[in-house]
Amino acid sequence: MADRFSRFNEDRDFQGNHFDQYEEGHLEIEQASLDKPIESDNIGHRLLQKHGWKLGQGLGKSLQGRTDPIPIVVKYDVMGMGRMEMELDYAEDATERRRVLEVEKEDTEELRQKYKDYVDKEKAIAKALEDLRANFYCELCDKQYQKHQEFDNHINSYDHAHKQRLKDLKQREFARNVSSRSRKDEKKQEKALRRLHELAEQRKQAECAPGSGPMFKPTTVAVDEEGGEDDKDESATNSGTGATASCGLGSEFSTDKGGPFTAVQITNTTGLAQAPGLASQGISFGIKNNLGTPLQKLGVSFSFAKKAPVKLESIASVFKDHAEEGTSEDGTKPDEKSSDQGLQKVGDSDGSSNLDGKKEDEDPQDGGSLASTLSKLKRMKREEGAGATEPEYYHYIPPAHCKVKPNFPFLLFMRASEQMDGDNTTHPKNAPESKKGSSPKPKSCIKAAASQGAEKTVSEVSEQPKETSMTEPSEPGSKAEAKKALGGDVSDQSLESHSQKVSETQMCESNSSKETSLATPAGKESQEGPKHPTGPFFPVLSKDESTALQWPSELLIFTKAEPSISYSCNPLYFDFKLSRNKDARTKGTEKPKDIGSSSKDHLQGLDPGEPNKSKEVGGEKIVRSSGGRMDAPASGSACSGLNKQEPGGSHGSETEDTGRSLPSKKERSGKSHRHKKKKKHKKSSKHKRKHKADTEEKSSKAESGEKSKKRKKRKRKKNKSSAPADSERGPKPEPPGSGSPAPPRRRRRAQDDSQRRSLPAEEGSSGKKDEGGGGSSSQDHGGRKHKGELPPSSCQRRAGTKRSSRSSHRSQPSSGDEDSDDASSHRLHQKSPSQYSEEEEEEDSGSEHSRSRSRSGRRHSSHRSSRRSYSSSSDASSDQSCYSRQRSYSDDSYSDYSDRSRRHSKRSHDSDDSDYASSKHRSKRHKYSSSDDDYSLSCSQSRSRSRSHTRERSRSRGRSRSSSCSRSRSKRRSRSTTAHSWQRSRSYSRDRSRSTRSPSQRSGSRKRSWGHESPEERHSGRRDFIRSKIYRSQSPHYFRSGRGEGPGKKDDGRGDDSKATGPPSQNSNIGTGRGSEGDCSPEDKNSVTAKLLLEKIQSRKVERKPSVSEEVQATPNKAGPKLKDPPQGYFGPKLPPSLGNKPVLPLIGKLPATRKPNKKCEESGLERGEEQEQSETEEGPPGSSDALFGHQFPSEETTGPLLDPPPEESKSGEATADHPVAPLGTPAHSDCYPGDPTISHNYLPDPSDGDTLESLDSSSQPGPVESSLLPIAPDLEHFPSYAPPSGDPSIESTDGAEDASLAPLESQPITFTPEEMEKYSKLQQAAQQHIQQQLLAKQVKAFPASAALAPATPALQPIHIQQPATASATSITTVQHAILQHHAAAAAAAIGIHPHPHPQPLAQVHHIPQPHLTPISLSHLTHSIIPGHPATFLASHPIHIIPASAIHPGPFTFHPVPHAALYPTLLAPRPAAAAATALHLHPLLHPIFSGQDLQHPPSHGT
């Protein structure tokens, strides 16, 4: 510090500047001090001057001091020398040596206490005073008084009283204001609610069934639209092409109903006038489809507003592709005739349209405005030159409270067939409607007309859509519709010609749209015959198409149109499942009869005269095509399917019969616009080819021009043709149902075509469903007369199932349309096409496509329809060239799936063109190879698009289904959850699978879920797919046994297509099983199915003796199977249906569908389709049961996969191959338990490479399952027993994913987070519990609960287990894996923990949360369903699925259902690619089945 204070140093030298030196580093300060000299006014300056200093002089004595300013130096804070030390000393002294204060010195304990007491006393006194004073405080006046007197005076004073009054007044005022405000709000809310309710009521009333009172009574009918709307929705979205099938609102509504429905008769002037009491909300518009003028696509969306927007299924959109119709000249003419009528009614419609202005706006999605649609319709009507009856249209306007306003109002456009007997009596409208129905949808219209009477208009309008959505298969398949529409068969006969004329086209088109939405609301639909809704309830196929809902008659709308679809709207979404379940069960028995009679009515109607038959076939086929298609697009898609299929089928029939079938076909095509657009042409072409005489030229024309379209159409037509082909087939076997068996294949085919044309609506609806669910084949056979009749039980059941699974199956049905149709045609074509395919092929083989379209007459009719759907898919995705082609070719494949089955499945699924070019070969080879390949293709494509054309073809077929689904899916890929989901999945698969595997898988799923083709394709396709990949050479065997058995339909087709490599008898057998299952007509099914199934069984018996017993069991269980499992699409897993079959499945289906429409639906669809196939195959002999199982199996496919192991285990005890069959059969017969069979064969088929698979398939009837299993993964094949359960769903998903390679893509895309899985499982559990309750009651009533339940659980368990195996281990999300494990373990623990050869796997499964499965009481059911002990199941084959015994235990009620739903979704999406991996892929899952080898049996072995 010395230097710092140097200036103060005495020693310092003052002489120089050294003392003033600036410190370094302060240049700025230094500069500043130098720049600024001291100022003269500075006090220092002045002092210096006083001393004699002058400016400029130096300082100091010698004046040598500094002259410049004194430097500024930074001074540090220094107290001075020693100051700091001193301060520190003070601080230390103060702190460390503190002195004691005086007070402290004096303070003692006593003093402290004294102070404390004093303070306390003071405080107490203060408190007391305060309390005292508080008594004299006026709060109101805020015044403190010290004395009591003062306070009293104040209280009594006016001042205080006045303040009190003011205060009270203010409080009262405030309360009043608040209450008045709240009251006003309440009133406003009430008013709004009232308005909403009023609007809803008006809308509901506008859709009241003719004789049933308001269609939607808030309490009576709030049932989901059965996926009809959903299908339509899907159709709308999937059939983006537009729906010429926009329906006039109330024209079809029965006026006698008066108020509820806005029946706008689209007569010249009557329009709304015709519906005097009906709300003027109906917009009826004719959609004209001039041949010359390709009409714009008209989009019609049917959306039933419901308080719960949850039911997307309520939304349906229908698109009619006018271009397709344009392609089908005949179709156009009927359409135009219809259009004439429609236009005649257009004024009314327009008035109605004004009422439904928004709807109208919405309506012309693609096709301009309602007016244009109406004018088109009028033109179509004029072109159709429909007889006296003008088409009537129903237009459903969604209630105001509808959250989801459809792009298009629910327009139920139904072209009435000839006035149905009932309809004629009921309405003057009937005549116009008859006219309307007459032209486009002879059969559908007839059905509706006959069965609907007053409801005819409603029914007709809704017939197709309703049939489509409500009862997809009108004739055989439409459970409710089939019953009602089939009822309309009598009238159908009378209406036949008209129906053919107008109904087909317009009804197809309109009906699909309008009918779907309105028909569902209208009446359940008295399709059974002329009978109207005589009872309070009518069985209606739910969206899943597997369950028959007991639909309130008042909600039914019956259409005259081919699928005399009674589409019932359930805006409030009341659940009629119970009745539906009952219906499914009763109708399992009843429907075979009803549908059988209905089918017979149809068939008889058709049989009596070719026109009738044509109409019948067209109707049935239409129902199938449109219905089945509608099945695919339950709401929109179904509508589309109906339209397209119906026009396609109807056209094919009419082309043959009337040459108007083409318009019908077109209509139908128009119906399923997007999907059907291509399909329509394809179908048109197909039908044309089928009806070469009438349509060869057109076929060539349409075929070349619209090959992809035609492929779709072909699919469609295939569906249609399938019905006719099956009809031919039916006649060939002379099924009882084939009233007018045309031994001459041409004639039969003409009839079939006619039937197909008519039937496509019915069979499309019914057949499709039936085929998809068992009704499809029924429809095919219904179209084929006998099978069509046989299918009724199945059809109805399937229709119910499909309706239930409409969402699923409608989703599927989009695919279901194709699938159903394809399945129908496959089943029938396999069966009949195998039998007739060659002949049919030869007859129709004027062109490969002719064969493809024609030869598949039935098969192609079905498949054409399917392919049409596919082609629609294909064409819809034409942009996706690969898929377009694959899909086209897949369509071809799809149709060829049938075609190959039918055309001799010689053709391998190697090339797109091969599908067509090798149609014959395919038919031959398809028996095992095409069916196998085709299926494999379908599966393959579905499963792994990359799987070469083989798979692509199959996949494309799957996609075609997807296409149908896509229709739906486009509209409601959410699977509108279930139906839409499937449909969309299908369409989605078609579109997206082209680009993505995921949709494809779903497509596959849906495809499988679809119908028999879905099951078959799913089953066979999966098997095929895996076969294609792994067992190409074994394909025939595998396909034959797996597909032949499992996919009886395909194998049937192949079997019938004796050219197939597989044993003809088995093929026949399979075909029969398939066909009979598909046909499900009691007689038809029994005779044809018995025949074919006998062959099949004989073939199979060698392979699987239990199969016969189980098939027999399945037969007894027809009531059970009657409960069609909703198609997979309805809700991914069909396990509930498998368990409760109907109730369980629907509930679960809804959950899965809603929850994961895509995945679940795919899985479910796949599984279900597969199971259907399996069921159908398995239940071939018991046609009804088979058909029922066709639907059930799809559900069971889902269920089956989960349940598969137990059945297989049970079977295993008997025989590895035979055992699967037995469980399958057992599950099949116990409709609720279809999954078991599927699973059996899911597990069993996979184990065998080809022979094992064959044996498994044959014996286990795991053909479908096996298909599912095999497709699950070529790798998975080694886990046949394991893969199927998981793989089935997986395959289902995989089918979609198959497009990419294995299901994994779809599977993978559909991944669930653990939370999702948990939620889903919980949801499913809840649904399951609910379903279980219902189902238990139902099962106790309808059929052996134990038998029904047992298979379901096994299916369920296998599913979750197989799923992981199927799905690539890596693909399936860990969550999925965990859930699968959870469910599998739960199922295993709950079901399989008990008597299981592999306790470890069960234990492993057990570790999976057991709650879901625990409730499932399978013990009694399993035993009844599965003859063998659980040990047997396990003993024979390492199918280590959840032990059958584990499944057997009674404690497990139906909880496995959620697993199936959950697992298929979770696991199914990624089954294919990771088939092998999947099995290995999830240690968790693996542990579940590791002990059992459930996961690895075939796959690992292989």
Swiss-Prot record:
Compositionally biased, Basic and acidic residues: which spans?
182-206, 323-339, 424-436, 579-623, 653-670, 693-707, 750-772, 1010-1027, 1042-1059, 1093-1108, 1159-1171
According to the UniProt entry, which residues carry Phosphoserine? Answer: 491, 653, 738, 740, 758, 911, 914, 981, 1009, 1014, 1033, 1035, 1081, 1107, 1175
Name the record gives this protein: G patch domain-containing protein 8
Q: Which UniProt keywords apply?
A: Acetylation, Coiled coil, Isopeptide bond, Metal-binding, Phosphoprotein, Ubl conjugation, Zinc, Zinc-finger
Zinc finger motifs (C2H2-type), residue ranges: 136-160
Residue ranges of the region described as Disordered = 172-251, 323-391, 419-541, 579-1301
GO MF, one annotated term:
RNA binding
Lineage, top-rank taxon, reads Eukaryota
Where is the sequence biased in composition, kind Pro residues? 733-743
Gene Ontology CC terms, in alphabetical order: nucleus
Residue ranges annotated for the G-patch domain, each copy included: 40-86
Q: Where is the composition biased (Basic residues)?
A: 671-692, 708-720, 799-809, 852-867, 919-928
Query: In which residue ranges is the amino acid composition biased (Low complexity)?
Result: 868-896
